[in-house]
A protein has these predicted regions:
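Well-ordered alpha-helical segments embedded in enzymatic catalytic cores
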Residues: 96-100, 152-155
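Structural motif
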Residues: 47, 115-117, 170
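Surface-exposed amphipathic alpha-helices with a cationic face
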Residues: 101-106, 177-181
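Hydrophobic residues in well-ordered beta-strands that form the structural core
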Residues: 18, 114-116, 189
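Asp-based, Mg2+/Mn2+-dependent phosphohydrolase catalytic module
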Residues: 1-8, 120-222
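A generic structural signal for short
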Residues: 16, 89, 111-112, 141-142, ...
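A generic structural motif
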Residues: 108-111, 183-185
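N-terminal helical cap/lid subdomain that shapes the substrate entry/recognition surface
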Residues: 3-12, 16-99, 105-108, 120-121
Length: 222
């Protein structure tokens, strides 16, 4: 009898890719371009994972819609230009990420996907830059409400036929974990990203990517 399909969803920024410098740099240029004070680094990292309009409203709560729109467009422009200039070095993969994805991709019943606050263009560029052709479902901010709304995960499950008991969400921020919880799936936190993993309330915590495959086997009792 064939094994049930298992869906493994990853956040991108702060989970698979170290885009901290790229994000804070683009955010600084966006705020400077709008004539505003640049938020502290900690504040910028605290909103990683949210859709850009919501993130900007968190960082600039007292400004009008036109200013928020200018910040969003300024960020997009700066981020795209720096990505085009730097290529894969713009958002390098964390140690062990590529190897973990390759190992999981070899398991016939494992389906890999992403659920990210990045745009479709941004995600496609990162995947192309790193040659990551293992994802069968790619959920991005362009087509969904911002995290922690569960829409991304629910859509990924619908696309793949996986049920909540056969799905995990792996991320580094509270938005990832809250999204997973809202979708009724198992959550796994990583400590190398932008929020304190110990405070996220995830079902599981891994210390490095080498722990992921054994943990999944334990979760699904394989």
């Amino acid at each position: 009898m064939s094994k049930p399909l298992r869906l493994i969803l990853f956040d991108v920024d702060g989970t698979l890719a170290d885009s901290q410098g790229a994000i804070t740099g683009a955010m600084a240029e966006a705020f400077e371009g709008a004539g505003l004070n640049v938020p502290p680094r900690e504040a910028i990292l605290s909103i990683v994972g949210l859709s850009l309009p919501l993130a900007m409203r968190e960082l600039a709560p007292n400004h009008d819609d036109a200013t928020i729109e200018a910040l969003v467009e300024g960020y997009k422009s700066s981020y795209m230009l720096s990505r085009q200039a730097a290529g894969a070095a713009h958002s390098p993969l964390y140690p062990g990420a590529r190897e973990a994805l390759a190992q999981l991709h070899e398991v016939p019943e494992y389906l890999l996907g992403v659920a990210t606050g990045k745009s479709q263009r941004g995600l496609d560029a990162l995947i192309d830059a790193h040659g990551l052709n293992c994802f069968v479902t790619r959920q991005v901010a362009d087509h969904h409400p911002s995290k922690p709304h569960p829409s991304m995960i629910l859509t990924a499950m619908a696309e793949t036929g996986a049920d909540p008991d056969s799905t995990v969400m792996i991320g580094d921020t509270r938005f990832d974990i809250e999204m997973g919880r809202a979708a009724g799936v198992t959550t796994i936190a990583v400590p190398w990203g932008y929020h304190d993993a110990a405070t996220l309330g995830a079902d599981y915590l891994i210390r490095d990517f080498a722990e992921l495959r054994p943990l999944l086997a334990e979760i699904w009792k394989e």
